[in-house]
Amino acid sequence: MKKILVTGGSGFIGTNLIEYLSKDTQYEIQNIDIVKPKISAQDKYWVQVDLRKHDAVIAAVEAFAPDYVIHLGARTDLNGKTLQDYDANMGGVSNLLDAIEVAGTVKRAIFTSSMYVCEPGYMPKNFEDYAPHTLYGESKVETEKRIKTANPFYTWSIIRPTSIWGPWFGEPYDKFFHIVLNHMYFHMGKRACRKTYGYVDNAIYQIMSILQAAPEKVNRNVYYLGDYEAYPITDWANEIAKIEGIHIPHVPYWCFKIVGWVGDFLKKFGIAFPMTSFRLHNMTTDNVHNLEPIKSVAPNLPVSRIDGTKVTLEWIHKYE
């Protein structure tokens, strides 16, 4: 039986990954996370560990003695005020690297970074070309640099999930669904954009494909994760609306600008609002990533966008 350690297994992607792994009898699973799992049936795999605590991480990894590590644990929100607020990402990966070395049992590891090591719309020249636009993105740049500098002896890869969505997701990627469902989405004509999104089951297929590929094919490589066809946002919104019987009206772009300014103003007072200038910029900026490297490892995605959308809507109606 192969032992797989998942960090951050109580998060969105982690919850779906644990669910997938738990159905395969060849794996013994452990999830180390600071928070409880979202699904109570996954409690048996969970050990409460704060990735920022060096000794606790070493103790947990050494005790489990994993064959494989999938590192998903991170702080992912954009609310931090300083880079140090994201030490779970930077110090966390350093602690994990130390722990894996101490354990001495790991054959492969996959470390999670983020597409936000570059701002939306920026196309990096290579995987050492960084252009973060948030503190979170800066923390993930530092995460990647620490892994590459350590250059561990085992087979390792870095993944950069794009806009992953599906059951058990949260802000910001659930916002799009809720905006459409609450009749708050409006088409903005030619300002609509195309982006790389990814259904969560497809992302898990990609992760597992990296884990199972020949070492020489994936070692020291960086991969963006996402569905292989970029999404025109207008088309996806129409699919959600059609399933739910919702009509989406068209509104001039300048109206969105005003609503974004209102959201900016309310944010200063700690009031959540579905639209801000930052979000509008993201909504109107093409952000299509090169997925050819991961496609060569994981060529056949298991779930179409429309099928994933139907499953996600069923989950929203059941759990939210």
Please give the residue ranges for each predicted region.
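Substrate-positioning beta->alpha
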Residues: 169-175, 189-212, 220-221
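Active-site Tyr-X1-5-Lys
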Residues: 131-157
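A hydrophobic C-terminal alpha-helical subdomain
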Residues: 257-297
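Mid/C-terminal beta-alpha module of Rossmann-like enzyme folds, strongest
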Residues: 213-274, 303-305, 309-313, 319-320
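NAD(P)H-binding glycine-rich loop region in Rossmannoid oxidoreductase-like domains
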Residues: 44, 51-89, 102, 120-124
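N-terminal Rossmann NAD(P)H-binding glycine-rich loop of SDR-like oxidoreductase domains
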Residues: 4-24
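Flexible, glycine-rich beta-alpha linker
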Residues: 118-119, 157-175
